[in-house]
Amino acid sequence: MSHKKQDAFQGLIDALKVLPNVGPKSAQRIAYHLLQHKRKEAEKLVDALQTALKQVDHCARCNTFCEGGLCDICADETRDGRRLMVVHMPADVSNMEAANCHDGLYFVLMGQINTALGMDVSAIALDRLAQRLGGGEVEEIIIATAFTAEGNATAYVLSEFFKNLPYKVSRLSQGIPLGGELEYVDAGTLAQAVYERRLIKEGGA
Protein backbone atom coordinates (compact mmCIF):
# COMPACT_ATOMS: atom_id res chain seq x y z
CA MET A 1 0.00 0.00 0.00
CA SER A 2 1.52 3.31 -1.06
CA HIS A 3 1.29 6.52 0.94
CA LYS A 4 0.81 9.87 -0.74
CA LYS A 5 3.84 12.06 -0.28
CA GLN A 6 3.11 14.97 2.04
CA ASP A 7 3.01 18.21 0.06
CA ALA A 8 4.90 21.34 1.09
CA PHE A 9 1.80 23.31 2.05
CA GLN A 10 0.56 20.63 4.45
CA GLY A 11 4.06 20.40 5.88
CA LEU A 12 3.95 24.14 6.63
CA ILE A 13 0.57 23.77 8.34
CA ASP A 14 1.84 20.90 10.48
CA ALA A 15 4.93 22.91 11.45
CA LEU A 16 2.82 25.92 12.49
CA LYS A 17 0.66 23.74 14.74
CA VAL A 18 3.52 23.43 17.23
CA LEU A 19 2.96 27.09 18.21
CA PRO A 20 0.93 27.78 21.39
CA ASN A 21 -2.83 28.04 20.85
CA VAL A 22 -2.52 27.36 17.12
CA GLY A 23 -4.80 24.56 15.97
CA PRO A 24 -5.29 23.14 12.46
CA LYS A 25 -7.59 25.95 11.26
CA SER A 26 -5.40 28.73 12.64
CA ALA A 27 -2.30 27.10 11.18
CA GLN A 28 -3.99 26.89 7.80
CA ARG A 29 -4.96 30.59 7.89
CA ILE A 30 -1.41 31.61 8.86
CA ALA A 31 0.05 29.47 6.08
CA TYR A 32 -2.28 31.01 3.48
CA HIS A 33 -1.47 34.51 4.72
CA LEU A 34 2.29 34.03 4.67
CA LEU A 35 2.37 32.50 1.21
CA GLN A 36 -0.12 34.87 -0.38
CA HIS A 37 0.69 38.21 1.25
CA LYS A 38 3.90 38.02 3.31
CA ARG A 39 6.49 36.03 1.39
CA LYS A 40 9.36 38.45 2.08
CA GLU A 41 8.41 38.65 5.75
CA ALA A 42 8.23 34.85 5.87
CA GLU A 43 11.80 34.67 4.56
CA LYS A 44 12.90 37.09 7.29
CA LEU A 45 11.07 34.95 9.84
CA VAL A 46 12.90 31.84 8.67
CA ASP A 47 16.27 33.65 8.82
CA ALA A 48 15.55 35.04 12.30
CA LEU A 49 14.50 31.63 13.58
CA GLN A 50 17.59 29.94 12.18
CA THR A 51 19.83 32.61 13.72
CA ALA A 52 18.12 32.29 17.10
CA LEU A 53 18.43 28.51 17.05
CA LYS A 54 22.18 28.86 16.49
CA GLN A 55 22.90 31.71 18.90
CA VAL A 56 20.37 31.55 21.74
CA ASP A 57 20.87 29.10 24.59
CA HIS A 58 20.08 28.87 28.30
CA CYS A 59 21.76 31.10 30.87
CA ALA A 60 24.16 28.99 32.94
CA ARG A 61 22.73 30.39 36.20
CA CYS A 62 19.05 31.22 35.80
CA ASN A 63 18.05 29.02 32.86
CA THR A 64 16.45 31.82 30.82
CA PHE A 65 17.29 32.38 27.17
CA CYS A 66 20.39 34.42 26.37
CA GLU A 67 23.32 34.76 24.00
CA GLY A 68 26.54 33.84 25.76
CA GLY A 69 27.09 32.13 29.09
CA LEU A 70 25.18 34.52 31.38
CA CYS A 71 22.15 36.72 30.84
CA ASP A 72 22.41 40.45 31.59
CA ILE A 73 20.62 40.12 34.94
CA CYS A 74 22.84 37.32 36.26
CA ALA A 75 25.92 39.22 35.09
CA ASP A 76 24.82 42.38 36.93
CA GLU A 77 26.83 42.54 40.17
CA THR A 78 24.48 45.17 41.65
CA ARG A 79 21.61 42.68 41.93
CA ASP A 80 20.79 41.28 45.38
CA GLY A 81 21.84 37.63 45.21
CA ARG A 82 20.15 36.83 48.53
CA ARG A 83 16.68 36.79 46.94
CA LEU A 84 15.89 34.33 44.17
CA MET A 85 12.54 34.56 42.38
CA VAL A 86 11.38 31.36 40.68
CA VAL A 87 9.21 31.96 37.61
CA HIS A 88 7.58 29.90 34.89
CA MET A 89 9.03 31.45 31.72
CA PRO A 90 11.30 34.23 30.43
CA ALA A 91 8.32 36.55 29.79
CA ASP A 92 7.69 36.56 33.56
CA VAL A 93 11.19 37.94 34.13
CA SER A 94 10.52 40.72 31.64
CA ASN A 95 7.25 41.61 33.36
CA MET A 96 8.87 41.67 36.81
CA GLU A 97 11.63 43.91 35.51
CA ALA A 98 9.08 46.25 33.92
CA ALA A 99 7.24 46.44 37.26
CA ASN A 100 10.54 47.36 38.97
CA CYS A 101 9.58 45.38 42.07
CA HIS A 102 12.42 42.85 42.44
CA ASP A 103 16.11 43.68 42.71
CA GLY A 104 17.22 40.10 43.27
CA LEU A 105 17.93 37.32 40.80
CA TYR A 106 15.71 34.81 39.01
CA PHE A 107 15.43 31.17 38.10
CA VAL A 108 13.27 30.25 35.11
CA LEU A 109 11.60 26.83 35.27
CA MET A 110 10.85 26.78 31.52
CA GLY A 111 7.73 24.77 32.23
CA GLN A 112 5.01 23.97 34.73
CA ILE A 113 3.27 20.88 35.99
CA ASN A 114 0.22 19.81 34.02
CA THR A 115 -0.72 16.20 34.65
CA ALA A 116 -3.47 16.34 32.01
CA LEU A 117 -0.80 16.95 29.37
CA GLY A 118 1.67 14.52 30.91
CA MET A 119 3.93 17.29 32.24
CA ASP A 120 5.26 16.07 35.58
CA VAL A 121 8.13 17.18 37.82
CA SER A 122 10.58 16.58 34.97
CA ALA A 123 9.05 19.61 33.19
CA ILE A 124 10.30 22.20 35.70
CA ALA A 125 14.11 21.84 35.77
CA LEU A 126 14.44 21.01 39.46
CA ASP A 127 17.91 19.56 38.89
CA ARG A 128 19.15 22.83 37.43
CA LEU A 129 17.48 24.74 40.27
CA ALA A 130 19.31 22.57 42.81
CA GLN A 131 22.60 23.31 41.04
CA ARG A 132 21.79 27.02 41.06
CA LEU A 133 21.30 26.94 44.84
CA GLY A 134 24.71 25.35 45.34
CA GLY A 135 26.42 28.75 45.40
CA GLY A 136 25.27 29.40 48.97
CA GLU A 137 24.33 33.09 48.69
CA VAL A 138 20.54 32.65 48.46
CA GLU A 139 18.55 33.33 51.64
CA GLU A 140 14.98 33.79 50.38
CA ILE A 141 13.17 32.05 47.54
CA ILE A 142 10.10 33.76 46.10
CA ILE A 143 7.76 31.41 44.26
CA ALA A 144 6.22 33.48 41.47
CA THR A 145 4.02 31.01 39.64
CA ALA A 146 0.56 31.92 38.35
CA PHE A 147 -2.63 31.26 40.30
CA THR A 148 -3.82 28.68 37.79
CA ALA A 149 -4.22 24.94 38.33
CA GLU A 150 -0.81 24.41 36.72
CA GLY A 151 0.81 27.26 38.62
CA ASN A 152 -0.59 26.08 41.95
CA ALA A 153 0.56 22.51 41.29
CA THR A 154 4.02 23.80 40.45
CA ALA A 155 4.09 26.00 43.57
CA TYR A 156 3.14 23.00 45.72
CA VAL A 157 5.95 20.86 44.28
CA LEU A 158 8.42 23.70 44.81
CA SER A 159 7.24 24.17 48.41
CA GLU A 160 7.81 20.48 49.09
CA PHE A 161 11.21 20.65 47.40
CA PHE A 162 12.29 23.52 49.67
CA LYS A 163 10.65 22.16 52.85
CA ASN A 164 13.81 20.77 54.43
CA LEU A 165 16.24 23.25 52.90
CA PRO A 166 17.54 26.28 54.85
CA TYR A 167 15.73 28.99 52.91
CA LYS A 168 13.01 31.43 53.72
CA VAL A 169 10.27 30.65 51.19
CA SER A 170 7.42 32.93 50.13
CA ARG A 171 4.89 33.13 47.33
CA LEU A 172 3.29 36.06 45.55
CA SER A 173 0.13 37.32 47.24
CA GLN A 174 -3.21 36.60 45.61
CA GLY A 175 -3.66 40.15 44.39
CA ILE A 176 -3.09 38.42 41.07
CA PRO A 177 -6.48 37.27 39.70
CA LEU A 178 -7.34 33.61 40.20
CA GLY A 179 -6.49 31.83 36.97
CA GLY A 180 -4.28 34.72 35.85
CA GLU A 181 -0.95 34.24 34.08
CA LEU A 182 1.78 36.68 35.14
CA GLU A 183 2.40 37.88 31.58
CA TYR A 184 -1.09 39.44 31.49
CA VAL A 185 -0.95 41.16 34.90
CA ASP A 186 -0.35 44.91 34.99
CA ALA A 187 2.82 46.26 36.60
CA GLY A 188 1.08 47.79 39.63
CA THR A 189 -0.73 44.58 40.56
CA LEU A 190 2.44 42.57 40.01
CA ALA A 191 4.46 44.87 42.26
CA GLN A 192 1.83 44.66 45.00
CA ALA A 193 1.84 40.86 44.78
CA VAL A 194 5.62 40.86 45.31
CA TYR A 195 5.62 43.35 48.19
CA GLU A 196 2.75 41.53 49.95
CA ARG A 197 4.09 38.04 49.25
CA ARG A 198 2.91 35.30 51.60
CA LEU A 199 5.45 33.53 53.82
CA ILE A 200 5.48 29.75 53.39
CA LYS A 201 8.39 28.93 55.70
CA GLU A 202 11.05 30.76 57.68
CA GLY A 203 14.70 30.34 56.83
CA GLY A 204 16.85 27.76 58.59
CA ALA A 205 16.98 24.00 58.35
UniProtKB/Swiss-Prot annotation:
A zinc finger (C4-type) spans 59-74. Residues 82-177 form the Toprim domain. Signal peptide: none annotated. It comes from the Bacteria. PANTHER family: RECOMBINATION PROTEIN RECR. Keywords: DNA damage, DNA recombination, DNA repair, Metal-binding, Zinc, Zinc-finger. It comes from Neisseria meningitidis serogroup A / serotype 4A (strain DSM 15465 / Z2491). This is Recombination protein RecR. Belongs to the RecR family. Pfam families: RecR_C, RecR_HhH, RecR_ZnF, Toprim_4. InterPro entries: DNA_Rcmb_RecR, Rcmb_RecR, Rcmb_RecR_Znf, TOPRIM_dom, TOPRIM_RecR. SUPFAM superfamilies: Recombination protein RecR. GO terms for molecular function: DNA binding; zinc ion binding. May play a role in DNA repair. It seems to be involved in an RecBC-independent recombinational process of DNA repair. It may act with RecF and RecO. GO terms for biological process: DNA recombination; DNA repair.
